[in-house]
Amino acid sequence: MRYRAVVEYDGTAFIGWQRQKGVAGRSVQESIEDAIYRLSQQHVTVFAAGRTDAGVHALGQVVHFDLNTSLQDYVIKNALNHYLRSDMVSILSLEEAAEGFHARFSAKKRHYMYKIVNRDAPPCLDRLRMWHVPKQLNVSDMQEAASHMVGEKKDFASFRAKECQSKSSVRTVDRIDCVREGNNIFVHVSAKSFLHKQVRIIVGTLVQCGHGAFPPSYVLEILERKNRAAAGITAPPHGLYLVLVEY
């Protein structure tokens, strides 16, 4: 039987979603697979909609796995949460999946949110869940810059990590919204798929624009140059959240 689950996790202590050979530390995938084994004594592979990097959080990661069991869905969910209780991972929902469902390849849209605290004083309580940017940001300029990245089939070669293995750097970004709420700024980014570290490079570029390092229209030149060195810094991972996956 194939199961589909929505998962929340704090990425702080993890090396990322995916198991990585030769890398010290624990992955989210490993934690969930270990919990399933403790429940069923079955070795399964858990697949995710988004292979989040080390330090990146999830409010609505979607996963699937195949399991041979007669247990009811709620029993599986509660048991996994019991085994995951010390790992900062929580199964929010779990149900039988339709035949052929794949958490990654069936996804139609992924929604990310990046959280910035924009004030002089550094945060204490959530310092590993947001990016502290002390210098005042112009959110209007950030939004104008973001508008140049929204639309069908743009080449984001300047906005992907050097280690990105995707064959094509062309992506359609459906939404980038920059919203200020008091001292907090939220950057919402939605697309069917993203390049490696694309969202974080977008956010880093928008922050530099918000500081006045370059005008919003300069984003057009960054896209045209198709060179990672042309774009801004890569925002740190701990402000990024995978919020929702649509199917």
From Swiss-Prot:
<dbReference type="InterPro" id="IPR020094">
    <property type="entry name" value="TruA/RsuA/RluB/E/F_N"/>
</dbReference>
<dbReference type="GO" id="GO:0160147">
    <property type="term" value="F:tRNA pseudouridine(38-40) synthase activity"/>
</dbReference>
<keyword id="KW-0413">Isomerase</keyword>
<dbReference type="InterPro" id="IPR001406">
    <property type="entry name" value="PsdUridine_synth_TruA"/>
</dbReference>
<protein>
    <recommendedName>
        <fullName>tRNA pseudouridine synthase A</fullName>
        <ecNumber>5.4.99.12</ecNumber>
    </recommendedName>
</protein>
<comment type="similarity">
    <text>Belongs to the tRNA pseudouridine synthase TruA family.</text>
</comment>
<dbReference type="InterPro" id="IPR020097">
    <property type="entry name" value="PsdUridine_synth_TruA_a/b_dom"/>
</dbReference>
<dbReference type="InterPro" id="IPR020103">
    <property type="entry name" value="PsdUridine_synth_cat_dom_sf"/>
</dbReference>
<dbReference type="Pfam" id="PF01416">
    <property type="entry name" value="PseudoU_synth_1"/>
</dbReference>
<feature type="active site" description="Nucleophile">
    <location>
        <position position="53"/>
    </location>
</feature>
<keyword id="KW-0819">tRNA processing</keyword>
<dbReference type="InterPro" id="IPR020095">
    <property type="entry name" value="PsdUridine_synth_TruA_C"/>
</dbReference>
<dbReference type="GO" id="GO:0031119">
    <property type="term" value="P:tRNA pseudouridine synthesis"/>
</dbReference>
<feature type="binding site">
    <location>
        <position position="112"/>
    </location>
    <ligand>
        <name>substrate</name>
    </ligand>
</feature>
<dbReference type="GO" id="GO:0003723">
    <property type="term" value="F:RNA binding"/>
</dbReference>
<comment type="subunit">
    <text>Homodimer.</text>
</comment>
<comment type="function">
    <text>Formation of pseudouridine at positions 38, 39 and 40 in the anticodon stem and loop of transfer RNAs.</text>
</comment>
